[in-house]
Structure formats: structure tokens, C-alpha cells
Amino acid sequence: MSQPAENWFLTAVVAGMLAACASSEDKPVEPNLLPTNYKQEILDTLSRTLGYPTNVREAYISDPALGPVGKDQRYMACVRYNARDANNHYAGSTDRIAYFYGGHLNQLIKASKEQCGNAAYKPFPELEKLCLATKCE
């Protein structure tokens, strides 16, 4: 074999090996898996995003249910709570909507009355008891 032919052949073999490695068959994510750990994922998110995540009052949550998100259906849950503001005063009740994708929390954003106005809320004592100190464990 001549030198250019050997180079071409070697390049083709290496390219084929790299292509075989790159074509892993990842399973597509099922977007509408029922979120089983939704309360903990919401607690984790609120503990990072609330200014004062402890001593939350009047905490409620709805069970995840399929609802419309654009043209798709996704699991969502509503959360209502009264947390303290930057001045350490209770700010009043806040409604948030949690969107789930593939069984995990994807977004937790402010909810409109249309989104959570008819939610079947139940007490969420885990949020009211949230404690971040090591002595809490």
C-alpha cells in the first residue's frame, strides 16, 4: 500500500472507532414520570432560595397532578407558605407552582391564581419544621 492510501485507511479506522464510542444509546427521558420525592426536592429548593427558610408558617402543598404546560402535559404541584422577608417580618402568603420533568423538580416559580387557585392543598409540616442547623438532625 502506498503512503497516502495507508494514511487514508488509518484515518478511516480511527474515525470509525471514535464514531462507535460517540454513539452511546442513551434512553430518552420519559417527561411524565410521577414525581415520588417531590416534597424533598421542593424543600431543598426552598432552603436555597428563601431568604429566611426557617420558621415558615401556614405551609401547604398539593399532590402532583398532570396539567397543561404549553402544548404538553407535565406534572405540577402547588405550594403555599408564609415566609419571612429581608426585614425578618412575615411577608404574607405566597403561592408557587412546581413543574416536574422526568419525575424531578424542574422549576419552582410564582403561581398565578389560574394555576393554583383551585389546588387541593394539604398541610406541609415538613416546610414549617425546616431547620438548617446541624443540631436539627
Feature-to-residue mapping (PLM):
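C-terminal motif of bacterial Sec signal peptides marking the signal peptidase cleavage site
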Residues: 17-20
